[in-house]
A protein has these predicted regions:
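Short, contiguous alpha-helical
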Residues: 120-146
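Short, surface-exposed loop/turn segments at secondary-structure junctions
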Residues: 29-39, 117-120
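Secondary-structure edge/capping motif, primarily at the C-terminal ends of alpha-helices
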Residues: 20-31, 107-115, 141-144
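Short, helix-capping/interhelical loops that line the mouth of catalytic, cofactor-
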Residues: 26, 33, 62-85
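Acidic/histidine-rich alpha-helical segments that form the ligand environment
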Residues: 5-6, 16-19, 51, 55, ...
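Alpha-helix capping/hinge segments and adjacent helical runs
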Residues: 12, 58-66, 96-99, 146
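Conserved alpha-helical segments that form or flank metal/cofactor-binding pockets of metalloenzymes
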Residues: 34-70, 137-140
Length: 146
């Protein structure tokens, strides 16, 4: 059911936003400035997707989740307790971004099955954004060859 897929997306995106937001404030090291800005771009983009996702849930006649407990329950992404070093932040966001892509692909399939083209278009835009983050995060993590 598309509404359930969107709720999972909503919770997962919220967790992704919170994690990138925390990494933005807590990153340290020689690449601080660059990573601080990069994490900011990610969390701002994730935040911007929350409201439209909730509105599409309402459009389908369901209520959007509205509590931290419900977000945690719905999310495919685990919360962050400790503050990792910069490289581990990148590795974790890379893995979480792949989880976002999986959730988005499931939503896209549901939207197409239910002939909800407007929602499918929104999801396609999110897939494009997270596809870009995937190659950017992969590039940050690439080890130079000797």
């Amino acid at each position: 059911m598309l509404a359930d897929s969107l709720k999972t997306l909503y919770g997962t995106n919220f967790a992704y936003f919170v994690k990138a937001f925390g990494f933005h404030h807590n990153v340290e090291g020689p690449d601080f400035g660059e990573l601080h800005d990069f994490f900011q771009a990610i969390y701002q983009d994730a935040y911007s997707a929350l409201d439209p996702t909730a509105e599409y849930i309402r459009y389908l006649g369901e209520y959007a989740p509205g509590s931290l407990e419900r977000f945690i329950e719905l999310s495919e992404i685990a919360g962050q307790i400790k503050i990792p070093r910069a490289r581990l932040m990148l590795e974790e966001l890379h893995a979480n971004n792949d989880q976002m892509l999986d959730v988005l692909n499931a939503c896209f399939a549901s939207a197409n099955e239910e002939n909800q083209q407007g929602i499918a278009n929104f999801i396609a835009e999110r897939l494009s954004a997270h596809g870009k983050y995937r190659w950017q995060l992969t590039s940050y993590l690439k080890v130079e060859r000797a």
